[in-house]
Amino acid sequence: MSTLLIDLKGKELEQEEVELLSHPLVAGLILFTRNFEDREQIQELIRSVRQRVKKPLLITVDQEGGRVQRFRDGFTMLPSMQAFQETLSATEQVSFAKEAGWQMAAEMIALDIDLSFAPVLDLGHECRAIGDRSFSSDVKSAVNLAINFIDGMHQAGMASTGKHFPGHGHVLADSHLETPYDDRTKDEIFGCDLQPFQQLIAQNKLDAIMPAHVIYSQCDSQPASGSEYWLKEILRKKLNFQGTIFSDDLGMKGAGVMGNFVERSKKALNAGCDLLLLCNEREGVIQVVDNLKLAKNQPHFMARQARLQNLFKRRVIDWNDLVSDLRWKLNYRNLADIQIRWLDIQAAKK
């Protein structure tokens, strides 16, 4: 049973990485800026992975837009999600959100990448980890923009991933650096932060969800990424979510309360995660592949494997054909203009 997504050290594939990626526990990989030099190089790296690892791998990236865009040179400057509401009219917002989703997904698929973890469904912009990665502080606006962004992704042939369930926007701490605590009541969380996830699930827009490394102390003592309450009781049963549940990166400091890397992996799986990200911790990856034991014949593991198959890209796009497309050309200019205007607005406030 494949469950781990791991990372690569650099711009070329190492033999140790071929062996790790070939391990039965490993389902795929996530790419970072350190793996990228230019488009030709990243395409060659992906081609090497596909050829040298003799099984289908889910290749992923965080190419959200704004400050979270791993590949820049030679790619569209994608706007931060907040930029749509801050720089455009109501009609333009939904139109360009859809185009941004399509543009991002089409460019990644043309590299032979299956999935970009997007969109961010957190509300508000105060959290250091989120900031302008979120669409809005308003539920209705965030949902409307997210629907259009996802529709663009789906049109290009990419599955969507809503993050960070049930909402990371109301904590100031950064879960990359520590475990944040959200002390609001259950009613406050369910009436606000949970709403984008609940509404998008109801409209069948989300193919995958990534929970937060945040402890919601009035609801459960575990981070959502390791919480049966959030993942089994709320996400699966109450919201009837049928898609894939990714853990956020188990190498992050916010996951540290769940123990060592093997313990974190076990807790996330037992809580209900299907696929586990473990990045920037090569020794941790080795510990997990050596010590995590999974039973292949259990029904919920079989369901996890079936859900994994729905995440692979749904079409093939040739890069040269893409950049010759008028839609891509118009988006390349217009989306960059939106981000430049947003950066100018931010600079003027300083």
Swiss-Prot record:
Q: Report the top EC class in one word.
A: hydrolase
Q: In which pathway does it act?
A: Cell wall biogenesis; peptidoglycan recycling
Name the positions where substrate binds: 62, 70, 133, 163-164
**For this protein, what is any one GO molecular function term?**
beta-N-acetylhexosaminidase activity
NCBIfam families reported for this sequence: PRK05337.1
Q: Where in the cell is it found?
A: Cytoplasm
A biological-process GO annotation: cell division
What's this protein's function?
Plays a role in peptidoglycan recycling by cleaving the terminal beta-1,4-linked N-acetylglucosamine (GlcNAc) from peptide-linked peptidoglycan fragments, giving rise to free GlcNAc, anhydro-N-acetylmuramic acid and anhydro-N-acetylmuramic acid-linked peptides.
**One Gene Ontology cellular component annotation held by this UniProt entry:** cytoplasm
Q: Which reaction does it catalyse?
A: Hydrolysis of terminal non-reducing N-acetyl-D-hexosamine residues in N-acetyl-beta-D-hexosaminides
For this UniProt record, the keywords arranged alphabetically read as follows: Cell cycle, Cell division, Cell shape, Cell wall biogenesis/degradation, Cytoplasm, Glycosidase, Hydrolase, Peptidoglycan synthesis
Coarse class of the protein's main subcellular location: cytoplasm
The Swiss-Prot or TrEMBL record describes its family as follows:
Belongs to the glycosyl hydrolase 3 family. NagZ subfamily.
Where are the active-site residues found? 176 (proton donor/acceptor), 248 (nucleophile)
Which organism was this protein described from?
Haemophilus influenzae (strain PittEE)
Q: What is its EC number?
A: 3.2.1.52
Q: What is this protein called?
A: Beta-hexosaminidase
* Record flagged with keyword Transport: no
Sorted alphabetically, which HAMAP family does this protein's record hold? NagZ
Residues with site note (Important for catalytic activity): 174
Q: Which InterPro entries match?
A: Beta_hexosaminidase_bac, Glyco_hydro_3_AS, Glyco_hydro_3_N, Glyco_hydro_3_N_sf, Glycoside_hydrolase_SF, NagZ_Beta-hexosaminidase
